[in-house]
Amino acid sequence: MKRIHSLAGILLVLGLIQSSCRVLMQEADPSSSLEADSTLKDEPRELSNMKRHSEGTFSNDYSKYLEDRKAQEFVRWLMNNKRSGVAEKRHADGTFTSDVSSYLKDQAIKDFVDRLKAGQVRRE
């Protein structure tokens, strides 16, 4: 399938080169522009439809290629961020740490009050 798309792309590029050469030749020789106009009018409708189809196919394939490329770059970016060793803290990590700190602080206050009641702490 990729070979067909590559072939369509090559044919499209060759067609563009041929048409640009035709334009350059017409600019160089004004009498040939009349002949070129008549050949364009005589061009069969099927050929123009084929050109339009090949251009559409090429642009569609190119768009898919760009989307795939962006997806690959995004995956690489994700992988590089994980490999960099910088662990980003999540919100849950912060709340867990805060909860543990609050618990330990409350426990320390409770222990201090218990020692005060027992008379183990000196008052100065």
From Swiss-Prot:
Residues 28-54 are annotated as: Disordered. PROSITE patterns: GLUCAGON (PS00260). It holds the Pfam family Hormone_2. Residues 1-25 form the signal peptide. GO terms for molecular function: glucagon receptor binding; hormone activity. InterPro entries: Glucagon, Glucagon_GIP_secretin_VIP. Residues 84-88 form a propeptide. SMART domains: GLUCA (SM00070). One of its GO terms (biological process) is response to starvation. GO terms for cellular component: extracellular region. Keywords: Cleavage on pair of basic residues, Hormone, Secreted, Signal. The keyword Secreted applies. Induction: Produced in the A cells of the islets of Langerhans in response to a drop in blood sugar concentration. It is found in: Secreted. Residues 38-54 have a biased composition (Basic and acidic residues). Belongs to the glucagon family. Glucagon plays a key role in glucose metabolism and homeostasis. Regulates blood glucose by increasing gluconeogenesis and decreasing glycolysis. This is Glucagon-1. It comes from Lophius americanus. The lineage of its organism: Eukaryota, Metazoa, Chordata, Craniata, Vertebrata.
